């Protein structure tokens, strides 16, 4: 990456070869990375006495960043666009990139332990305000860059791989990672005022419902978050389902046993309140405010002082709920 930044013209003619070599090495290293960090609990981000990184996760991170940078090179784009013309979503190189991204975007054992005991850390990662740049976040960025260049093929490629993933015997981490990558892509769509197509949006509904019903809290939380993101970026495509998704999130706040899921549902409420018409959200204003108030009342206020991201999520969701109809909020005060 440093050589490329200093001598871009020198590396540009070789960018296609470098891209292919990087992709190949990432594919070869994936089983080792999965064993060390996703199935086992190897220590990551280690440096030697000279401050030089030497653990595998650093190499993966550099190669994912370099692969993303190569996607902007004209020789790489020309070759990949030509290949894509003769490919279907089932066998396209875009779908293969999605497979690679999902593999490296899986929650590591270290992250699982941290997020399970501190939802504030989870929220800071979710909102991308943390300085902890990991292979998981790099995969999200890779898919975002690909989506900016090839929007429809990226959406279709991710949907195609997600279908294959959910119809197989893969564990919850891979299924969560596929929805995480989608969530990152939808977040970028929201930022640039872009929408996902109705057919693709509908194609994810069954995976979201499946995720919401699973015993693993991380997959369950991801299902609620993606349901909100998809509602926000799909226009009217999910209008008939959005109310039930909103109500499911509202019901899970007091009833789900996982604090991670409860907080994810509170965050997802923001997406619904921003996207759905007043006629849908107004009848639910009081229940939403009550759910947030009850969640807050059950927390240790001394611990909340150190949970900035959690407090921001609570305040922003409460703000959006109040703005539905400020007259009702005034009545609640008195």
Where are these regions (language model features)?
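Karyopherin-beta/Importin-beta family HEAT-repeat alpha-solenoid scaffold
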Residues: 1-333
